[in-house]
């Protein structure tokens, strides 16, 4: 199945233009994922949109791999409507920096999607036009989808019910 990923048109074009940026290419159940260096995310996404016609950013999210380095992975799910092709781009982000450049200048839909990843996971999207909480209140402490966030919430006693 690795052949499917390696023969993917987008992967071939990305390897031609961004060879040093690509860390890994994977295929799982017919879906291709390209893991890239975070430093090149804007140029790479711009190329995907302008040259390869991936004109729809369907989601931006983050995954917390607590205990691993890098701890976070920022995930971009994109789709080419003209080519009827889906692609996933991932960029590792270390816990110490916890930053990546915004892709709002590439896809305007990134605005609220990046705000959600910031609010719930604490990923800072540099140069974002309006990076502030979107779901939690402004005075909320922490980022509730991180794996080290207390299950019972901040400033609350652990649950003493059936699970204790």
Swiss-Prot record:
<keyword id="KW-1003">Cell membrane</keyword>
<keyword id="KW-0997">Cell inner membrane</keyword>
<keyword id="KW-0830">Ubiquinone</keyword>
<keyword id="KW-0874">Quinone</keyword>
<keyword id="KW-1278">Translocase</keyword>
<dbReference type="GO" id="GO:0005886">
    <property type="term" value="C:plasma membrane"/>
</dbReference>
<dbReference type="GO" id="GO:0048038">
    <property type="term" value="F:quinone binding"/>
</dbReference>
<comment type="subunit">
    <text>NDH-1 is composed of 14 different subunits. Subunits NuoB, C, D, E, F, and G constitute the peripheral sector of the complex.</text>
</comment>
<comment type="function">
    <text>NDH-1 shuttles electrons from NADH, via FMN and iron-sulfur (Fe-S) centers, to quinones in the respiratory chain. The immediate electron acceptor for the enzyme in this species is believed to be ubiquinone. Couples the redox reaction to proton translocation (for every two electrons transferred, four hydrogen ions are translocated across the cytoplasmic membrane), and thus conserves the redox energy in a proton gradient.</text>
</comment>
<dbReference type="Pfam" id="PF00329">
    <property type="entry name" value="Complex1_30kDa"/>
</dbReference>
<dbReference type="InterPro" id="IPR020396">
    <property type="entry name" value="NADH_UbQ_OxRdtase_CS"/>
</dbReference>
<keyword id="KW-0472">Membrane</keyword>
<comment type="similarity">
    <text>Belongs to the complex I 30 kDa subunit family.</text>
</comment>
<dbReference type="InterPro" id="IPR010218">
    <property type="entry name" value="NADH_DH_suC"/>
</dbReference>
<dbReference type="GO" id="GO:0008137">
    <property type="term" value="F:NADH dehydrogenase (ubiquinone) activity"/>
</dbReference>
<keyword id="KW-0813">Transport</keyword>
<keyword id="KW-0520">NAD</keyword>
<dbReference type="GO" id="GO:0050136">
    <property type="term" value="F:NADH:ubiquinone reductase (non-electrogenic) activity"/>
</dbReference>
<dbReference type="InterPro" id="IPR037232">
    <property type="entry name" value="NADH_quin_OxRdtase_su_C/D-like"/>
</dbReference>
<protein>
    <recommendedName>
        <fullName>NADH-quinone oxidoreductase subunit C</fullName>
        <ecNumber>7.1.1.-</ecNumber>
    </recommendedName>
</protein>
<dbReference type="InterPro" id="IPR001268">
    <property type="entry name" value="NADH_UbQ_OxRdtase_30kDa_su"/>
</dbReference>
């Amino acid at each position: 199945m690795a052949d499917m990923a390696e023969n993917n048109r987008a992967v071939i074009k990305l390897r031609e233009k961004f060879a040093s940026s690509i860390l890994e290419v994977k295929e799982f159940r017919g879906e291709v994922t390209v893991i890239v260096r975070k430093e090149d995310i804007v140029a790479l996404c711009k190329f995907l949109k302008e040259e390869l016609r991936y004109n729809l950013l369907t989601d931006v999210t983050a995954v917390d791999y607590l205990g691993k380095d890098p701890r976070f992975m920022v995930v971009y799910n994109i789709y080419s409507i003209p080519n009827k092709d889906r692609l996933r781009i991932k960029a590792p982000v270390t816990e110490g920096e916890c930053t990546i450049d915004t892709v709002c200048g590439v896809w305007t839909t990134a605005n609220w999607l990046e705000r959600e990843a910031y609010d719930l996971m604490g990923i800072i999207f540099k140069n974002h036009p309006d990076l502030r909480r979107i779901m939690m209140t402004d005075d909320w402490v922490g980022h509730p989808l991180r794996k080290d966030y207390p299950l019972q919430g901040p400033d609350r006693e652990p649950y003493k019910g059936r699970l204790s």
